[in-house]
């Protein structure tokens, strides 16, 4: 089985037989290298660990190229089980799914996602597993194309891509406004391939690799100093509410009054130009709010001269569905943004006839949202055009290009109480930092229990609220104008460039075989 899927014929010099124990050790080593990537991401942010963990995979691939797919798959499985272990918290601890169902489901997503590093490893070894120019062309390009496909196929799940580990501490983060997170992915993989080559290279090659690495990483430092967008108008004061409502209480009828009062009091005590409440902060449909509540909220906002927006479920205009929306409550017309990129299994149920029975064991209200539609206009609040995205939507950089180009700032509303006290909320904050860097715009994050934050256009955090506390985070933000190179061209240059590099690696191989 291993031989059949591992790309036989990659390396004629490989032994024809390998002991099962050696194969097992190699697979475990790959999985362990993948698992350690957890510490490259937030909250640990050891960005230098990602190229090292990926270089460990490269070393294993060059030792045993015939098992390339399985080594890449083991690396991916270790990485995604480690990074997404919070899935168990959301399924078992919060949604109430029995452990005997939750535990296997935790492995399903990593088992699927690991296919992409497996296929990327197989493809690179199929082209040429030996350290050299063709490997440097093939491996990083194959890896990035795998990451791109992972973020696109079956609605996509780009969370945990290697490039996010570089946001914002690494010099490579400077490339995000240039080519987005996918260019950073590519450079991480290129760094890993070059790092693994150092051990086998001659002195002249080592010097060349080190000079190239210094130029690439040093250029990232220079790119970080470029201001890709410019201020527009005056700064405004912003207030971001964090209600800290436990997920098991959020939709409870007994806790409804407490939830509504929590956010009313936060609005009443706040003085700012713009205030944003988190995703589904008001746990009722808009037209089901208690009589007078909306007037009270508007009254407090009006007295403070404050624009107010809140996450709240809203029925579709035809009444047949419902939307995960953000409504401008202070505007009598109540314009809204409705989430378009829904979370599979969380906000809609794929294949309900096949897996619908699982939801009978779960406490998961509102799991059948309707998409809001693409190209929704930004909301105008406090004289600013604000492009909203809801929770998981800020995982998709290219989808935010259009909204960001029509707006002066970005805002994300989220409810991360689903994931308990895990790394999920810190990882999600890092995604938002990447979006700020890519678009050169402020990102205002209002979350239920963390990480509520104000992120500057350079991706750095201006202010952040302590998680698991009820508070209102205040600070300043300013609209920006102009487009970063990534906003102009999107992912296409990186994807086409990686395809061209793979083709070049193949052509060089054919040329070499022709000469012999």
Swiss-Prot record:
Quick one: signal sequence residues? none
The regions listed as transmembrane in this protein's record are: 23-43, 68-88, 94-114, 135-155, 178-198, 489-509
**An example molecular function term from Gene Ontology annotations:** N-acyltransferase activity
Q: Is Transmembrane helix among this UniProt entry's keywords?
A: yes
Q: What is its EC number?
A: 2.3.1.269
Q: Where is the CN hydrolase domain?
A: 241-481
CDD domains reported in the protein's UniProt record: ALP_N-acyl_transferase (cd07571)
Q: Where in the cell is it found?
A: Cell inner membrane
What biological process terms from GO does the record include?
lipoprotein biosynthetic process
Example of a GO cellular component annotation carried by this entry: plasma membrane
State which pathway it belongs to.
Protein modification; lipoprotein biosynthesis (N-acyl transfer)
How would you describe this protein's topology in the membrane? Multi-pass membrane protein
The keyword Cell inner membrane belongs to this UniProt entry's keyword annotation: yes
Tell me, in one coarse class, where this protein mainly resides: membrane
Give the keywords, sorted.
Answer: Acyltransferase, Cell inner membrane, Cell membrane, Membrane, Transferase, Transmembrane, Transmembrane helix
**SS bonds (residue pairs):** none
Identify the Pfam families for this entry: CN_hydrolase, LNT_N
What is known about what this protein does? Catalyzes the phospholipid dependent N-acylation of the N-terminal cysteine of apolipoprotein, the last step in lipoprotein maturation.
Q: Which family does it belong to?
A: Belongs to the CN hydrolase family. Apolipoprotein N-acyltransferase subfamily.
* Protein's name in the database: Apolipoprotein N-acyltransferase
Q: Which organism is it from?
A: Chromobacterium violaceum (strain ATCC 12472 / DSM 30191 / JCM 1249 / CCUG 213 / NBRC 12614 / NCIMB 9131 / NCTC 9757 / MK)
Q: Its gene?
A: lnt
């Amino acid at each position: 089985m291993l031989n059949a899927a591992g790309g036989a014929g990659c390396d004629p010099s490989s032994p024809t037989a390998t002991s099962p124990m050696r194969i097992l050790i190699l697979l475990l080593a790959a999985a362990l290298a993948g698992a350690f990537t957890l510490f490259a991401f937030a909250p640990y942010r050891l960005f230098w660990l990602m190229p090292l963990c990926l270089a460990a995979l490269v070393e294993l691939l060059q030792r045993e190229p015939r098992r390339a797919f399985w080594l890449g798959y083991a690396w991916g499985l270790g990485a995604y089980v480690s990074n997404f272990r919070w899935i168990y918290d959301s399924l078992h601890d919060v949604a109430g799914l029995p452990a005997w169902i939750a535990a296997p489901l935790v492995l399903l997503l990593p088992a699927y996602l690991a296919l992409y590093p497996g296929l990327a490893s197989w493809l690179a070894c199929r082209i040429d597993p030996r350290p050299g120019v063709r490997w440097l062309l093939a491996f990083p390009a194959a890896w990035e194309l795998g990451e791109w496909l992972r973020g696109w196929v079956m609605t996509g799940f780009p969370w945990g891509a290697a490039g996010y580990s570089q946001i914002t501490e690494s010099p490579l983060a400077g490339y995000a406004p240039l080519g987005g997170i996918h260019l950073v992915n590519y450079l991480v993989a290129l760094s890993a391939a070059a790092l693994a080559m150092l051990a086998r290279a001659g002195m002249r090659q080592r010097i060349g690799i080190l000079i190239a690495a210094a130029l690439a990483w040093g250029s990232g430092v220079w790119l970080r100093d470029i201001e890709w967008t410019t201020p527009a108008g005056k700064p405004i004061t912003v207030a971001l509410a964090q209600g800290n409502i436990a997920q098991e209480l959020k939709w409870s009828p007994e806790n409804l009054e407490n939830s509504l009062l929590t956010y009313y009091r936060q609005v009443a005590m706040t003085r700012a130009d713009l205030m944003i409440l988190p995703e589904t902060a008001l746990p009722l449909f808009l037209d089901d709010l208690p009589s007078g509540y909306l007037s009270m909220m508007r009254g407090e906002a009006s007295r403070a001269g404050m624009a107010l927006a809140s996450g709240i479920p809203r029925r579709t205009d035809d009444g047949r569905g419902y939307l995960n929306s953000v409504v401008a409550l202070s505007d009598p017309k109540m314009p809204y943004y409705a989430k378009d990129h829904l979370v599979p299994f969380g906000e809609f149920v794929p294949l309900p006839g096949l897996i619908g029975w699982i939801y009978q064991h779960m406490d998961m209200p509102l799991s059948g949202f309707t998409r809001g539609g693409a190209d929704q206009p930004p909301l105008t609040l406090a004289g600013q055009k604000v492009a909203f995205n809801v929770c998981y939507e800020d995982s998709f950089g290219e989808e935010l290009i259009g909204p960001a180009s029509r707006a002066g700032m970005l805002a994300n509303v989220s409810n991360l109480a689903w994931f308990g006290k895990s790394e999920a909320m810190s990882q999600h904050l890092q995604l938002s930092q990447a979006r700020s860097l890519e678009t050169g715009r402020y990102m205002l994050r209002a979350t239920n229990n963390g990480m509520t934050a104000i992120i500057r256009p350079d991706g750095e955090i201006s202010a952040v609220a302590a998680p698991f506390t009820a508070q209102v985070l205040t600070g300043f933000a300013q609209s920006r104008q102009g487009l970063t190179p990534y906003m102009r061209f999107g992912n296409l240059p990186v994807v086409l460039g990686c395809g061209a590099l793979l083709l070049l690696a193949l052509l060089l191989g054919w040329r070499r075989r022709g000469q012999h």
